[in-house]
């Protein structure tokens, strides 16, 4: 009996141990994050970040600690074979799964001084195109998730609260950038004549290039973000650089580690290197003068850190805007970078400003083509003005160009022109002379563009690319216009039109998508605006307009494999030549809310407008039907009809109130869609209730309701 009892007890212990282990493993899934009612939170707490829309969640910190304790170190066998999994809360109420690993952004010497500062890198499971960087700091948990659906951010609900959090879309973040100014000036690089502009292929991802970052902080910055302490300010710097690294790793395979003695250049009150406690009066920086701080930073970093001990230098402040010197890392001017903002927190500070100013240091110029407000004053770069208005990528000026703003904040990608410049500097320029390279095992995707085409003016068109990836990574596509203002002379009118005869860029970039097709202009403007996008959407420039003149537009597609640890990218180029004497090619019927019957013939008409003649030579068209308002066109009504302006087609046996017709050139990329929904409804009349009373017997006819009347309704044998 004792032996049996002992065996049962041992078995029970093993069972309980296994159950406990299983519970611990499942806790991050079930209990790490819980939605919470904001009304239960402290309404008087000081908040740094208040988006217009957000979800509040509560973090189980003990469960998070369990999850983080299972994280393997990056670039280890364990990271490949036994990745840890974490769930992150999304703004829409869902939870998203990620594989994650520990990924330090501090050199070991600094990490040893601040062991509670932990940073991680993650790759999406539910959405493999999503990558993330998150941290666990004394100030709480912070995350950035980069995905085609949009950037998601997770931040503490309030200062000092490490339990309650907000998760929100970047597009819903408040605009905190109105006081910022970047004082970088175009170094007046030699320009190419418009006909000589070329688009070299850009590839990256086989090597992760790691650089040592000396990141100084003025006393004013440490007071603003870190309670005037070195630890508090460094935590804020780690948060910012973790997010910056997330973008640089995915787009450029560049990683920056904060140097071992960075605490010595963080000029908080408990840093005693200023002849005592550091203050705004005795630290080595002129906080509100960015240009002056460029030289001060070089002197300070070389003296305190040593020129041989860092590869790129930068300083954070609360004034002076942003300014940097082109092509700095590994060179003598490597410390010449400044980012200053009165409220130096949040994603806008990290991406719109720090990533932007460091982008200059890595070799990228401004990419906006606007000329008013901050886009004026010599800030526009003649050699790289590839985006309408303020632009919207990292090296543009989203949110600070007044009437020419494209959006309140940038999207978290670099324009292909910026990719070219940074890849060239870091891979084959001076920036390649001091990098620590790590083989990633990643092979960039191979992307194929559609080729070159000739189209009529004022007519929608689509470009489609395809890509393969030998590693099986999930690919996204980003079609961008690659045209400078003619001769780089600057804008002479609203910067997203060519109707004045100037062949400037007229299509803005968007967040990369999972599909390889981009339609110009975006489909809503075709369906709702008769192919003419409004000049503004809300308070911002629309940034899309069909060409109105003879010109050749160049487009590049960037294929990304979205590897979180070192993204692979590749590009392809297509030229679209516009014939100003032809077009618009346009559907003319059905263009009203008509109603047609299924299985009947309908005459589709369109304006040919010179599209059959050389050099367009579109002899035939394809005619398709949509039943969902023009979003998809699965039904082909005519695969190859003569491009003569009219074709009788058979309406299929379907019913809908949201039908549209699409007529597209066979062997070309241009098309048009009918302007208005029309209906396909059956013409067979449906019996109406008004016929019922005629069959109802009158009171005097009651006997006719007896069973003797039943046989009249019975079918004969």
Residue ranges, per PLM feature:
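N-terminal prosegments of processed precursors
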Residues: 23-158
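The catalytic-center signature of Zn2+-dependent metalloproteases
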Residues: 259-289, 329-410, 480, 484-496
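Exoplasmic/lumenal beta-rich domain surfaces
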Residues: 257, 476-549, 615, 622-647
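Proline/serine/threonine-rich low-complexity linkers at boundaries of modular beta-sandwich domains
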Residues: 429-446, 576-584
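Extracellular acidic, Ser/Thr/Pro-rich low-complexity tracts
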Residues: 466-471, 483, 561, 607-614
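Fold-level signature of zinc-dependent metallopeptidase catalytic domains
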Residues: 26-33, 37, 164-324
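Ser/Thr-rich, Proline-interspersed low-complexity disordered segments
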Residues: 684-716
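Short, solvent-exposed loop/turn segments at the edges of extracellular beta-sandwich modules
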Residues: 560-567, 666-670
């Amino acid at each position: 009996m004792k032996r049996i009892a002992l065996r049962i007890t041992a078995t029970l212990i093993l069972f309980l141990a296994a159950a406990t282990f299983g519970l611990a493993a499942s806790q991050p899934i079930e209990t790490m994050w819980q939605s919470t009612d904001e009304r239960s939170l402290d309404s008087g707490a000081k908040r740094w970040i208040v988006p217009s829309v957000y979800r509040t969640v509560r973090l189980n910190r003990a469960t998070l600690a369990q999850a983080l304790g299972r994280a393997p170190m990056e670039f280890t066998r364990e990271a490949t074979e036994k990745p840890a999994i974490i769930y992150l809360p999304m703004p829409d109420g869902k939870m998203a799964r990620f594989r994650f690993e520990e990924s330090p952004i501090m050199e070991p010497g600094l990490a040893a001084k601040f062991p509670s500062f932990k940073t991680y890198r993650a790759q999406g499971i539910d959405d493999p195109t999503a990558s993330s960087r998150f941290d666990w700091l004394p100030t709480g948990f912070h995350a950035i998730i980069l995905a085609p659906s949009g950037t998601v951010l997770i931040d503490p609900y309030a200062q000092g609260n490490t339990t309650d959090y907000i998760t929100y879309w970047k597009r819903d973040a408040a605009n905190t950038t109105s006081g910022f100014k970047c004082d970088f000036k175009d170094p007046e690089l030699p320009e190419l004549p418009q006909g000589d502009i070329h688009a070299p292929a850009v590839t990256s991802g086989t090597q992760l290039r790691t650089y040592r970052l000396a990141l100084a902080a003025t006393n004013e910055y440490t007071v603003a973000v870190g309670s005037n302490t070195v630890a508090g300010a460094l935590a804020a710097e780690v948060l910012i650089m973790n997010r910056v690294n997330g973008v640089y790793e995915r787009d450029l395979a560049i990683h920056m580690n904060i140097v071992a003695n960075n605490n010595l250049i963080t000029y908080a009150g408990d840093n005693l290197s200023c002849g005592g406690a550091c203050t705004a009066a005795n630290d080595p920086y002129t906080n509100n003068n960015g240009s002056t701080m460029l030289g001060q930073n070089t002197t300070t970093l070389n003296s305190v850190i040593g020129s041989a001990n860092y590869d790129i230098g930068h300083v954070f402040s609360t004034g002076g805007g942003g300014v940097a010197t082109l092509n700095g890392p590994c060179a003598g001017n490597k410390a010449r970078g400044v980012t200053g903002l009165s409220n130096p927190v949040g994603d806008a500070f990290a991406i719109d400003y720090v990533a932007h100013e460091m982008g200059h240091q890595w070799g990228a110029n401004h990419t906006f083509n606007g000329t008013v407000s901050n886009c004026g004053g010599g800030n526009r770069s003649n050699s790289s003005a590839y985006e309408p208005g303020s632009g919207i990528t990292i090296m543009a000026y989203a949110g600070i160009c007044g009437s020419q703003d494209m959006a309140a904040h940038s999207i978290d990608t670099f324009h292909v022109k910026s990719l070219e410049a940074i890849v060239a500097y870091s891979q084959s320029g001076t920036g390649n002379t001091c990098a620590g390279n790590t083989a990633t095992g990643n092979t960039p995707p191979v992307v194929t563009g559609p080729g070159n085409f000739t189209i009529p003016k004022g007519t929608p068109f689509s470009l489609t690319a395809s890509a393969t990836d030998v590693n099986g990574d999930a690919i996204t596509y980003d079609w961008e216009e690659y045209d400078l203002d003619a001769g780089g002379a600057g804008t002479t009118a609203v910067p997203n039109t060519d109707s004045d005869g100037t062949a400037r860029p007229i299509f803005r970039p968007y967040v990369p998508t999972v599909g390889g097709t981009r339609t110009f202009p975006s489909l809503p403007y075709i369906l709702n605006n008769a192919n003419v996008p409004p000049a503004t959407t809300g308070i911002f420039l629309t940034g899309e307009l069909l060409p109105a003149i003879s010109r050749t537009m160049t487009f590049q597609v960037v294929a990304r494999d979205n590897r979180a640890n070192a993204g692979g990218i590749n590009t392809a180029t297509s030229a679209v030549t516009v014939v100003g004497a032809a077009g618009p090619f346009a559907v003319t019927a059905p263009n009203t809310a008509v109603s047609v019957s299924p299985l009947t013939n309908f005459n589709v008409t369109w304006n040919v407008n010179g599209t059959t003649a050389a050099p367009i030579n579109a002899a035939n068209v394809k005619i398709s039907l949509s039943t969902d308002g023009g979003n998809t066109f699965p039904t082909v009504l005519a695969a190859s009809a003569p491009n003569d302006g009219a074709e009788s087609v058979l309406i299929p046996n379907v019913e809908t109130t949201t039908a549209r017709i699409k007529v597209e050139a066979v062997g070309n990329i241009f098309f048009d869609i009918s302007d208005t929904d029309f209906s396909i409804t059956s013409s067979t009349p449906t019996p109406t209730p008004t016929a019922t009373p005629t069959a109802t017997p009158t009171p005097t006819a009651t006997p006719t309701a007896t069973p003797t009347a039943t046989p009249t309704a019975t079918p004969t044998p």
